[in-house]
Structures are given as C-alpha cells and as structure tokens.
Amino acid sequence: MSARPRPEVLAPAGDMDCVRAAIENGADAVYFGIQKWNARARATNFALEELPDLFALLRLRGVKGYVTFNTLVFSNELDEAQRTLEKILAAGPDAFILQDLGIARLIHEMAPGVPLHASTQTTTTAPEQMELLKELGFSRVVLARELSIAEIRKIKSQTDFDLEVFAHGALCVAYSGQCLTSEALGGRSANRGACAQACRLPYDLIVDGKVRDLGDKKYLISPLDLAAYELVPELMDLVVSLKIEGRLKTPEYVAATTRTYRKAVDNAAATFSRDEVLALQQVFSRGFSPGFLSGTNHQALVQGLSPKKRGVFLGKVSGVRGSRAAVTLEAPLKPGDGIVYDYGKPQDDEPGGRVSYVWRRNARVDLADRPDSVEFEVWECPPPQVGWKVWKTSDPAMYRELRATFEKTTGARVPVDALVEEDGDKLRVTFSDGVHRVKGETGPLQAALKRPLTTDYLRQQLGRMGSTPFELRNLEAKLGQVMVPVSLLNDLRRRLCEDLEKVRRANPGYAVRPGALDRLRAKPSRTEGEPQLAVLCRTVDHVRAALEAGVSWIECDFDDIRKYRDAVPLVRAQGAAIFLAPPRIHKPGELGILRNVLGAGPNGILVRSTAHLSFYRKEAPYLVLIGDFSLNAANELTTDLYLSKGLARLVPSYDLNWEQFQALMARIDPGRAEVVIHQHMPMFHMEHCVFAAILSNGKDATDCGRPCDRHAVTLKDWTGKEHALKADVGCRNTIFNAVPQSSSQYVRKMLDLGVRWFRVELLQESPEEARQLALNYRNLLEGKENGETLWRELRASNFMGVTRGPLGREE
C-alpha cells in the first residue's frame, strides 16, 4: 500500500509579493481573490488582466493557484459574474473556492472539469452536508474552524471528500457564513467580503440587568489567533490541505508562516525553535491558541484584554530612570526594534516607538535577550510607569531576513531529472520534471583522447541552473568514451531550461461552454394565494400569544428543544400548523437532536443547514420543509437549487437590499419565498459560549454548570445598546441586535411582486407585546393597517427605535 500523500501547505496571497513569499518558502498552493466577489475585499487582490501571468508563474514553479470567489452573488450580478468567470477560466486556475452554491452550479455548467472547493463560508460541519456538495461537483471542503480533531476524524470516516482545515491565522468568533453583525450594525456584509470586525470591539457584560465588573476584560468576543503547528502530526492522515489565513497580511507574514508549516509537514516529528516561534508571533499575533482543534475550551479561546496585534511580549517595566525604562527580558531586544507600552487600555492611543538605545549593566549593547535585565530608551516617547507591559511590535532585522527569502529566486526549486545518451555523432539530453519532457542535442561528439565525459562532470555542468527555478536531482548517462566542448554543453543546458520553462508555463486551458447561465435560469412560475403570516416564537408563552392573535402558522426556535413537546399540542388544538427549528449548526454525533425535534410531531421543519435537508428528506419525507435565512440564498440559481431539493419555500438571504430583493423575486416564484418582515437580526452565531467563559470556570458544556439557564445576559456595545445573548441546545451562542428591524413599509410592494408568505420573529417580548405585534402585522397583511403608520407606531413604542434593516440600505 502506498503512503498517503502529505497534506499541501496552502498559503494566502493578497498581492504579488505575497505570492512570491509563498513560492520561495515552500507553499504547495496559494489562494487569492480578484477585485470583486471575494471574502477579503480590503486586500489588494488581483486584476483579471494579471491572472494569465500569475498562473503561468505558478505553473512554472509547480505551485497550484486557487481563486477565491467566496461571497454571495446577487441576481442582478449574475451576468457580470459569468463574464468574469469566463476570464478566470481562460487563465487556467487549479480550483475555485466558493461560498454561493448557485455559482458552483454556474461554473460546473460552464466547465464541468474545473475543481471546486467549498469555502469555510459554507459552514460545513458534518458529513451529511457533503451529499449536496458532491452533487454540485465539489471535490474538497474547507471545514468550519469550530471543529475539533476528534470531530474531523469522525467526518473523515464517513466521507470520501478531500478535507481542508485552517491551521494558522485569525479566528472569527462567529461561524463563517453565519455572521450578520456587519450587515446589521453597519450595512456592510461579511458575506460580501466587507466584515467590519465588530468582534474586535469592547463590550460590557450585563447580567440580570447589572453591569458585571470584569476589570480589564472588555473584548469579550475577540479570540486569540489560531496556531496549530504542533498539531500537524495529528492532522496528517485526516486532511489534504493545511490552510494559512492571511490575505490581508504582509509578505513577511506569508514567508514566516509558510516556512513553518512546510517544516511541520515535511517532518511530522519536528520541534520548533524559540526563534521560529518568535518569528510567528512577531509577524502577526494577538496571542496564540489551538482554537477548537484541541477541543472546546471557552476559558482559553478568548482572553478579552486586547483585540490588537501585539507581537512579542518583552516583559514588564520594573523601573523608570529619566527617559529609560527597565525590564527583565522575555525575548530579544535591540536598537531599531519597535515597542508599545500596554497599560490595560488598548482602546487608547498607546505610547511607544523605536528603541534608540539598549543598556545592560550601564553599557550600551547591540542585542540583549532573556534573561537579561536591561534599560532602553524610545525616541520621543514619554516615560512609562512601573508595571506596564512591553511588547515588541516590529523587528526590522527579522523582516529584512524574511524579505530576503523571496526577493530573489533562492527558495523552493523544481527538481529535474536528466538523461544523457549518444545518438549517432550527437549528444542527446532529456530534462524531465516528472510531467513534462524536453529534449535537445549538441555535437558532433569527439572521441575522448584524455578526459571522456563522466557522470560527475555532466552533473557539475548540467546542474549549473543558476537563476532558473530548477535544480538537478537525478542524472543518468549512457555514454562511451566521448567528449564535447563545455561551451556546447552549457548552451544546451540553457536551451533545455528555457524549453522546460516554456512548457511549464503553458496554459492547459478549460473548454468553456457558452450560454451556461441561460440554460440554468428557469422561467419562473407564480404561485397565487392569500397572504399568510407566520410568527416565529421563542417560548411557549409566545406561542399562546400568537395563537390569541389569530395566527395559523407557528414557527418555533426554542433554546430548550424539549419544550417543543409542550408547544405542538397547543398549536394543533387550535387547528394551526407548527414548524420546528433544529439548531443552526449540526456536528458529528448530533443526529439525536434532529430526531428529538422530529419526535415532537411538527407539521414541518425550519431547515437551517443542508444537514437538516439531508436528514429530514430521508427520515420524514412527509414533512413540509422551509429553508431558512442561514442557507444564504441570494440569487435564483441558489434558490432554484434548494427548492428543487424538496423545500416548500425559502427565506431569502438577509444580505439583500430592496433593489437586489426585487431582482431575485423577478427570477423566482415569489410565492415560494418567505420574507421576514420583523425581527431582531441574529448577528454573531458562535461555538464560543460567553456564558461559560465568564459566568463559570468551566471549559465546556460538561463542567460549566449551565449559567445560561439561570441568567439573562446582554452585551452592551460602544453606543450603549444592549444586544441579547442566547444559548441553544448545542451551547452555541447567538447575539441578537438590540434594535428591531421592520419592513412594514415594503409589504405592499412585496405583495405586488407576488410574495405571499411573511414572517414576524419574536425574541424577548412579553406575551402581550408578542400578541400585539402579531396582530399588527396580521392587520397589515389583511389591509386593515397601513405600512407607514405601523412603522411610525413601532418607532414610537420601542425604546431603541426601529430600523428598516438591509432592505433600506443603498448599495
């Protein structure tokens, strides 16, 4: 049995310098975005015109190139997206990394042979989700960062998919593809590459109505960075790719991280020197953790003291003498290094600067290191106070060393084998890189009178590959007693290297079938009927209130799914229909939760994951399935896909503004859309449990004592708004926007578009508030109330006011 291939080292590239840094430091593949439709819109990214040369370089160096097209695409953008994809395909990518399943359909229709990788934005956490991905032509999935190695092992045992995991870099506190915070608070969508990083901002914790004093801990949902270099041996047999986050980071970061993970993969038993770890910390670090790979530990994931890149910890100020600060070093320090003083208020403009001098025992030195006690001075910086922490934020010498690794072609080279043989009176030489072969000849050969060509001599001459990307690996010579002038041999070597470069750069190309989008677009039908109101309830009291308001479609999303069994008979007794929501995230070993929801006896299910779709289609084909917002349906290709898989109707993506919403409704059957017209937007959806992290000493659900059952908690933001925190049955937390949003002003227009299903979502309303809210929207749909009037009433009656949400946002 052949040994399993080692996982690839997959490096990020936000610009061309990062590409070079990745290549020269041993990356097997790089991933990068174009200037639109990628999840790192703030990166420099690449123009379409740059792609042919970029892919030619990557092919030459034997490095794969993956294009991230990993955002949602709206209906009114699909034609442009198709034209863009045609240009990318013409450049010869090795794979696309995708979020939008409609775009996967489009690419597969355009060029069926193109490899597709499911982005972490698809929130893939279970093998059940991979059934649909396989149908769409995906061969690899980038797993959610919230999975442990044990969970990855379970997934691996149940699928033949290639698995990719993030091994290093920044961690999102929310599940990728499920974070609506930037959209809710700033009108800029993380699903469109415009994350505003609200997780890196300070929050106060309000417990049962009172501010909890947490000291300096303000950054309650800002996780440490992932660093899994020591876990690589455990991942080697599970994944095909180790991914480094960082398309917004520097080339030096790419160089340092790539070479570290290259070493980890090449030598699974490798240990890492202090200097190697310090280099990782220096290029970018908020502090390192294994993330969720080692299992859940809510106490370790978030420290809460700072959201900033800190670099390397040097020590604490032990004394101040004039402009000098004294510290016992934990890491190297030298003149020219950049430092910052940390006094526990990272939101302030912290003092710091370049170190001008370092003294050890009153003598100036060029370098000091642990455990030296030193004094140092910083140019034009006020003196610190005793007890302040000191961080080294930059190390110019280290950055010069890292930059030197990619400023010239001196790093990873392509191995070449040579065959040298006689062909009549000619010398024939063949170069092979394992895929391509080039041949050349020179001569005429001469009988050797004194010094015939030897294998060692040929290796010496043919191995002088200089600035080419090649290195001679094996050489086989089949020669008699002959010789050839060295000038001819050198000329032949140069020509063969040039020929090999040319064939390696060549674009194999993809045959693109025209008209793909037109073939996929179905002519929409139109389902007629009276407007229907569904109310999503979060407690049994909410259910009673909605029924009292005359609502006949009840949807339930309870923290405790055991209480579904109390809600179902209440609803059925009134002749109404009830739909139950399983937890949004489904992991290996959690099928029991889905079965418990089914056992409550609902009329249907709110499908919030493709795992739900797979399970309930098989286990209960009689149920009515409603696709929820978390499926991220933003265009007709995605919507039609889900509806064709058994959904009765589908909630469109919350990322759509009014213009984009209209474009979608024009391309689908609007009678099969269910539109949420009132809600508190679910912003962060997290594996990290704030309840456990702060209100207990527990690491996870097994030892936290479930403070979520005993306390009402909100997070108070920088504007004074208090956002509700809820935990579901899987202990995953959701933070809901404090300010409700209403689309009452758009309801009349939606009816004109053909929309027939509307939803109102409750959160923490009292039974009377819930009843009145349901009644107001029921009256609106029945024409007894005006949308503008209802908007004003809601705005006046709510302490926090009300917003229009994404529909009111202009692009």
What spans do the regions from the language model cover?
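Glycine-rich, highly charged phosphate/nucleotide-binding loops
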Residues: 46-51
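Short, conserved phosphate-binding/catalytic loop or strand-edge motifs used
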Residues: 128
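Conserved non-cysteine loop/helix-boundary elements of the Radical SAM core domain that shape
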Residues: 41-45
